[in-house]
């Protein structure tokens, strides 16, 4: 047979079942778990919203492609959240405290209790510049020259890795990629969710700068050997997605994609959801392609990505602000304000 580097269905529940994920953290005393309750009675869930002193995140238990979560006080009102719960016909929902801070992701290779982590990445879920608009599968992301991001302090990255290590210790049979999405709060990192796979777009930030041969990691996992330590190039990266006009609410599918691959320059080009026809590639209703810039600073990497986007042609929406100095600085300022510094 063909060796597969990935968790079994039982371990993958850490992604596919959000109620399991929270109970697993609670039962194993894993730090970073927000206050939560699970409900299969939607009327009871709505009553909990009425009685709760503060804002909540509403999370359907199953997979929603990164677009099922609604946050009271950010995306919806309490009344809108209750309407969403009643009309969506989910079998079960998790209601948990709204986490305030800056999100980041750490991806890791896991096998036989070993965990090898990549640099932190920040994704941008909102569709429009300035973090406005509906949630998407991710409009782009960036990483810095080291393991942590500019808004993080010493120890924040290590605290998040410790949460992942304790998670793996409580799930010793887990093999594959473990994706930890965190909210950096004034109390340290809190777990937004775990995924049993690479992040999209975050994998496009980390894999191009991975200098340890990817095959060596898989071979070690297959053979039961210790996973090799991971070496990265030390470059900053910026990834930006080109999506169909109207994405995600009313995407314009069927537009011909005319990417001039010769003008991508130093950027990397990754096709995503495209429809291959006799006359070329066409958009679907999902994200079309991404470009990645790598350089010795976030700002320089952003310029490479932006230059590569000149190859995109017409009919696409792009968040040009991702990785630009003003947006990166706004993340730093946000955490500084929350910390009261």
List each language-model region with its residue ranges:
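Active-site "cap" helix and flanking loop/linker of ATP-utilizing ligase/carboxylase catalytic domains
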Residues: 159-169, 174-178, 195-264, 276
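A short, GP-enriched loop/loop-strand-helix hinge that lies immediately N-terminal to
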Residues: 1-17, 29-39
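Internal nucleotide-binding/catalytic subdomain
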Residues: 68-198
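Short arginine-rich
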Residues: 90-91, 307-323
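Short, well-ordered beta-strand elements within core beta-sheets of diverse protein domains
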Residues: 287-295
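Conserved anion/nucleotide-ligand pocket segment
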Residues: 53-74
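A cross-kingdom feature marking charged/low-complexity
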Residues: 322-341
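Short amphipathic alpha-helices in soluble, non-transmembrane regions
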Residues: 254-256, 302-309
């Amino acid at each position: 047979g063909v060796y597969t580097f990935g968790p079994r269905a039982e371990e993958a529940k850490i992604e596919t079942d959000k109620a399991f994920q929270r109970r697993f953290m609670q039962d194993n005393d894993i730090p970073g778990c927000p206050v939560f309750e699970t409900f299969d009675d939607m009327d009871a869930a709505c009553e909990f919203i009425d009685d709760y002193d503060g804002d909540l995140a509403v999370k359907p238990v199953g997979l929603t492609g990164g677009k099922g979560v609604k946050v009271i006080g950010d995306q919806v009102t309490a009344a809108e959240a209750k309407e969403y719960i009643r009309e969506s016909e989910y079998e079960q929902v998790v209601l948990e405290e709204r986490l305030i801070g800056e999100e980041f992701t750490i991806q890791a290779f896991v096998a036989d209790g070993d965990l090898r982590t990549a640099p932190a990445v920040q994704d941008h879920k909102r569709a429009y510049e300035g973090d406005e608009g509906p949630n998407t599968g991710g409009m782009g992301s960036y990483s810095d020259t080291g393991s942590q991001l500019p808004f993080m302090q010493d120890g924040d990255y290590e605290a998040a890795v410790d949460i992942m290590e304790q998670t793996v210790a409580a799930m010793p049979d887990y093999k594959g990629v473990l994706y930890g999405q965190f909210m950096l709060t004034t109390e340290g990192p809190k777990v937004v969710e775990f995924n049993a796979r690479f992040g999209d777009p975050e994998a496009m930030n980390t894999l191009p700068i991975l200098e340890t041969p990817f095959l060596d990691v898989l071979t070690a996992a297959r053979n039961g050997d210790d996973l090799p330590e991971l070496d990265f190039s030390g470059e900053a990266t910026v990834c930006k997605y080109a999506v169909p006009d109207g994405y995600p609410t009313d995407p314009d599918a069927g537009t011909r994609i005319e990417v001039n691959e010769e003008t991508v320059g130093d950027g990397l080009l990754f096709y995503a959801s495209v429809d291959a026809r006799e006359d070329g590639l066409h958009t679907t209703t999902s994200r079309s392609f991404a470009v990645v810039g790598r350089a010795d600073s976030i700002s320089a990497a952003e310029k490479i990505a932006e230059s590569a986007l000149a190859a995109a042609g017409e009919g696409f929406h792009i968040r040009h602000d991702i990785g630009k100095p003003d947006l990166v600085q706004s993340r730093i300022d946000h955490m500084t304000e929350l910390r009261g510094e």
